[in-house]
C-alpha cells in the first residue's frame, strides 16, 4: 500500500533567532514544537500502601536519583502524539522537517542588514526626469507617450509576503520588498488605459538604474522578471554578490497608495481599458465591456498594505501558525500547483488561514499540524465559486462579485479578489489534493508523511494527455479570429489567459464527461538583464487533460433526439459538423450521434479517442490543422507493438489478427486459449487424483508480457518449436499415497504428467512433449508448460535431519523457489490480473517499463521482471494522486519518477492486495525491516501473500544489486530530464521513443558480437542497438523452452562476476556488453591453488588475473554464439568509415586482413517443382 521511509529523529532544539519575548508569548499557548496541548484533566491517583522497608527504599531512591520527573512539555508531547498522530514516527518526521526548513540566523541577519542598506539608498535618491534612466523599461505594452518625473519615495521600503510573516521557504529563499510610489507621481485619470502600469514600470526602471550606481549594490546582479508570469507586474530581482547569493534572491515590487484612486473605480463590472488603446472601434451606443481581471491587477498594488496588515496580525509572534503555513507551502510546492499566472499561490493559503481564524475554525493555540489539517479539511469541502471574504463589512454582495470570476475570495477591503486569475479547474485540483491529504492522514496503514510532504509530483505527471500549441502563426490566428474583443480588453491583450479561456471552454464542451479536468501547464518566466528589452511571453499554450476512466474511452457521443429537442439537435449538428449522423439505437430511439471507434478496436486505439476528438474540434471549430499542434498521447505505445517486419499473413491460424497489432491486443487470445485448455484439463476423468485448481503464472496471464504472442508454435519432427512457453501450475487434490522419498515423488509426478498428456491426445487431439520442467502442450498455436504442485514435495524439500536423528523442516533456497512458483506466484498473478481489470493502464504501463529496462541492457538476471510488475502495481495501489491515470505513458513517467527519487536503502514497498494485511502485521514488518535492514535485499518488495518470506521473495542482494540500482536511478533521472524538457518547452517536440529506448554505448569496455542467425529477433518494434545498425531479420522458432543465450550469460555471471559485469538486451539483443571490475580486482595477489582462475605469473612470486585470458574463457563458454570481440570505440570508428560490421548472416568471425576476392560462382538452379515442394513444406514454414 505505501512506502515506508526510514528516518532518524533529531533531538529538538530551540532556534537561536527567537527572542525571549517570543518564547514567553508562545509558552502559554503552544509548545516550542508547534503541537497543541489538550486540556489538562486532574488525575486522581489511588494511594498504594507500602511497607516500611519499601517506603525507606523509595524515599532513598528519590532523594539520590539523578532522573528528573517529566516536565509539562514532555507530558504534553506524549498526549499530542496519542491524540493527533497515528504514530510517534509521523510526529518526529514532521518535527524534523520543520527544523530543517527553518530560516537560519545568517540569512535573517543578512536580510535585516540588506533592508537597512536599501532603505538608506532609496532615501538618498534624487528626483529627476526619465532621461536619466539608462536601463530598459520592463514592460511590453501599447504605450502612450507622456512626461514622467521620478520622485523620491516618501515611505520606507517594507518586507512583504513570506519575509514579513516569517514563513520563508528554501532551497532558494525569495525575499519580497515593497517600495511605494509617491502619490504625486499620478494624475486623476491614470487608472485608465494602462497608464498606471506604464508609470509603475518606468518608476521601477528608474529605481533600478539609480540603485545599480550605488556602491553598496554595485557588485550585485540586477535582473527583471514578471511576478507570477504576469507581464503587467515586472519586478526587480537582486542577487547578492556574496556566497549567500546562491540561496538568496531579493525582489523589489513597486506599489501605490490606496488613496490615489477610488477603489470603487475598479469594481468588476467597470471598464478601465478603452478599445481605442488597441486600435479598435466601439459603438458608443453599446456598453463598454467589463475588465474585471485588469481591475484586479491594479487592486493588487492598491490593497497590498491593508492585506499585509491582516497577515501580520495573524502570523507575527505565532510560531504555530507560521509552521502550519510552512507545512502547507511544502505540500503545495511538491504538487507544482502554485506556478504561473493561473497558479494557486502561497499568498492565497496565508489569506485562507487568516479567514479560518476569523471564522473561529482555527484557535490561537492550534498546533502546526492542526492548522494544516484544518486547512486541508476545509479546502476539501469548500466552494469558493459562491464567494468568501475577509472583509468585516463587504461593500458589495458576494454573489454579484462571484459572477465575474471562476473563483471568488475577496480581500480585507472587499474590492480585490485574491483568486481573480485562478481558473476553476486549478481550484478544484487543489481541493482534490486537500481531500486526498486528509484521507491519507486518516489511513493508519499508510505512511502519509512521505506521500504528503516528501514525494515530488510534478503537475505533468498527473496528466493523461497533453496539448501544445506553440506555432506563432497558429497563435496569431486564434487571437485574431476566435478570441472575443471583450476578453482581449479584460486581459490587456495578454495572450496566455485568452488562449486558455478559448481552448478550455471549447474542449470542456466537446469532451464533457470524458475529462476530470483541463489544467494549464506553466513554466516560471526566466529573468532577463536590466539592459535588455522585456520579452514577450504567453505566446504558447500547454494544456494537460486528466481523463475519466469510466467515460474517456466511450466510442459514441449521443446527442438529443430530434423529435424531442429540435433546437438541441440542431445545435449538436452545428457543433460536430459532418461527424454527426442520425442513428437508430436498439432501444428504438433515433438521435444525433458521433461515432469515434468500434467496440472491437484494440485498447490502445480506444485510448486515442480523446486525441481524435480534440484534433477534430480544433480543425472544425478553430481551423487548426493537426500538423499545427502537438497532441501527446500514446507516443510510447509503439514499443510493445508488433514489428512491421513480421507479416501476420503467413500465420496458419483461424484468429483474425491485424498487422498493426500489439502485445496488449494479443493477450486476450492467449487467455481465451488458456481458459479452453483449463476446461479440457478439468474434463479429464480417468486421473488418479482430482485437479483442484489451474493457475497461469506467466506474465501474459496478467497482461505483463511485452513480446507480442502470436499463435505460431508448431510441431516439427515430433518436437515443439515456440518462441515463448506459457507456464501453468496444476494443483492436485490431497492424498496419503504419495511416497516419502523426494525422488520417488517426482518420478510419480512425471508419470502423472505422461498420463495427462496421453489423455489430452486421445480426448482432445492435442500434441504434447515431456521435458525436464514439465509437460509441453501445443494448442491453437500456443505452447503451454504444465507443472504439478503438491504440498508434500515442498515438505520433503524442507525436511532435514539433525545429528541426533530428529527430523526438522527448514527453509532453503530450493524450497523457497518452489513455494514461490507453485503457491505464492499464482495468487500474486491473480491479484495483478484483477488490478489490470480495475485499472486498464496497469498492463501497458508494465509493458513500456519492461521494454525500457531491457533497452538499457538489463535482463532478468540483473533486474527481475516480476520486480517491475510489483513496482508498477505499487504505483497503481498507492493514492499518490486524486485520480488514477488511464494513460500507460503517464504511468511510465510515474514509474521513472519512482526509480529516480526512491531511497533504496530505506524504503519498503508494500503491496497489500485485498487489504489482507492487518495493521499489526504491517507494523511488525516495518519494525523488522528497520531493525534488520541488512538481512533484506537492496530492493525490498513485499506482498500480502508472501507469508514468512515477506520482503525476501521477489528480489535478492544480487538481483538487483546496489550498483544496478544506482545505474537505474541515474538512467531514470536522465530519461525524466528528456521528457520534462520536451513536454514543457515551447520549442521542442515530445521525445522520440528511440531517445528513451536505446541505451548509450558509452561506458562499456568490450562488446561481444553474437551470430544473428542463431538468435531470433524480437517481435516487438525494434528501435535498434546502441552498438550496431540493424541486421537481417531472423524470426525462426527455437525449440520450446530453450533460451540458450540466457543460460550462457548466467554461466558467465556465475563464473566471472568477480571480474566483469555482463549486459545484454533480452528482447532480441545481438550483442553482449562487458564492463570490467575496478583495477584492484586485477592487481597482483599471492599465489593460492584455489584462486588461479585466469591468472598468469608475475613478479615477486605473485599471480595476476589477465583480461585477455578472461576474454578467451568468455569465447569458450559462448561457443557457437560468438562472432567477434571489439570495443565500442572500434564500432564507432567502423560506422564513421561506413564499414559494415559483421553482424549479418555471412559474418565469418574475427576481422581478417583483406584477401583477394574469389570469383563468384553461378547459383545452382533449382527445379520449379522442387521450389514448390520446399515452399509447401510444413517444417520450412514452422522455422520461418
UniProtKB/Swiss-Prot annotation:
Q: Where in the cell is it found?
A: Nucleus, Nucleolus; Chromosome
Pfam families from the entry? Answer: Nrap (PF03813), Nrap_D2 (PF17403), Nrap_D3 (PF17404), Nrap_D4 (PF17405), Nrap_D5 (PF17406), Nrap_D6 (PF17407)
Give the record's GO CC terms. Answer: condensed nuclear chromosome; CURI complex; small-subunit processome; UTP-C complex
Look up the domain of life of the source: Eukaryota
* Chief place where the protein resides: nucleus
Q: Is the keyword RNA-binding in the record?
A: yes
Q: Name one GO molecular function term.
A: RNA binding
- Kindly state which keywords UniProt assigns to this record, in alphabetical order: Chromosome, Nucleus, RNA-binding
Ranges where the record places region Disordered: 1-42, 1133-1184
Q: Where is the composition biased (Basic and acidic residues)?
A: 1-10
Q: Which BP terms in the Gene Ontology apply to this protein?
A: ribosomal small subunit biogenesis; rRNA processing; tRNA export from nucleus
Assembly, in brief, is:
Part of the small subunit (SSU) processome, composed of more than 70 proteins and the RNA chaperone small nucleolar RNA (snoRNA) U3.
Name the family: Belongs to the NRAP family.
Q: What does this protein do?
A: Part of the small subunit (SSU) processome, first precursor of the small eukaryotic ribosomal subunit. During the assembly of the SSU processome in the nucleolus, many ribosome biogenesis factors, an RNA chaperone and ribosomal proteins associate with the nascent pre-rRNA and work in concert to generate RNA folding, modifications, rearrangements and cleavage as well as targeted degradation of pre-ribosomal RNA by the RNA exosome.
What is this protein identified as? Answer: Nucleolar protein 6
Annotated source species:
Drosophila virilis (Fruit fly)
